[in-house]
Amino acid sequence: MHEISSVQPRDPDVVDAVKPKRFKYFNVPFLLSAAALVILGLVVQYSATYFDADYSFTRQLSGVVVGVILMIVISRFDYHALSGFTLAFLIINVVLLLAPHLPVIGVEAKGATSWVALGPIRFQPGEFAKITVVLLAASVMARYGGRLDDLREYLKVLGILAIPFICIMTQPDMGTGMVYLSIAAFALIAGGANWRFLVGTIAVIAGLVVAIFMLDPVFDSLAGHDVLLKDYQRSRLLVFMDSTYDVSGDGYNLRQAMIAIGSGGFFGKGFMQATQSSLGFLPEAPTDFVFCVYAEEFGFFGALILLALYIVLLALVFNIARNASDLFGTLIVCCIAGMWIFQILENIGMDIGLMPITGIPLPFMSYGSSFMVVNFVMLGLINSVWVHNGR
């Protein structure tokens, strides 16, 4: 881990010498692995959205096009210029995450006020806030030069990183909030926070989760309405502990997800042959349960290929982090990698009953134009760290 908090450029002539001139602005292996995932995502989205009028493949494709353009622009931008804007990132986070509560533009959907509508344009600010959460976490931790042993400073950092989580929970959006926590966790780990502080934080959070789950019915009965947990959140936790619970709701969703994966066999049923989604048995097929559609069509073998691509991508990402010219660059890349790791484990894990059901999407695979654009912005930030390594 780097022991410096400021940029210490390497000789640009030496750096450029090891990069082919045609590709000096693009890390080809890294971007090819991401492109392979995007292509697989478009293939499965074409199938998943074909039979569902609520989703548009064209909109998903437009997200990819916009994302590619932004990725190219961001790759050319020197990420070092962002290192001193901690307060700005925090303010942007708060504004984005509270925007859905504003009258006229705020939109409620599926029990959460998470959307903003500006004329014909509708998007989730919480998705775009992932970018500023990454930059906020990286800029905060970079100030400590790779070592954070002072408890008071550690608590100060926790307080800053908790603000986006608190804001997103006012919507409420637990899934996105968990993603923010994963970003913060990887920033603390990669930034050299004392391991005793980290263990203590995990213990406190675990205790709070148990306390909330146990006390929720008491508070609900006293108040006459949901206080700590929404009904669907409690149901998902109970289904995770007992898959036979709520067989007509979240328990049904899990059962159909596992049927879809199991029915794919080793080589799958084939493209456009995912009957669980096409016949309407699998809920939210293009979004939460897109892995089930993919596994049903391409089988266990296809799932192994998908996981292998994720592993290759993450290995290349961590290599970029290891060779970054400064701690800020390392932290940006590690935060993004941590976010993707959490999303992959949670999304696939919930499909096979190993994790609670949430609305956390699968990187480059799940439906959502905003989601795709944000992932491409993340690719651009990582590529910028590689391009400007020593510049």
Feature names for model-found ranges:
Residues 69, 77, 136, 210, ...:
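Transmembrane alpha-helix boundary/anchor motif
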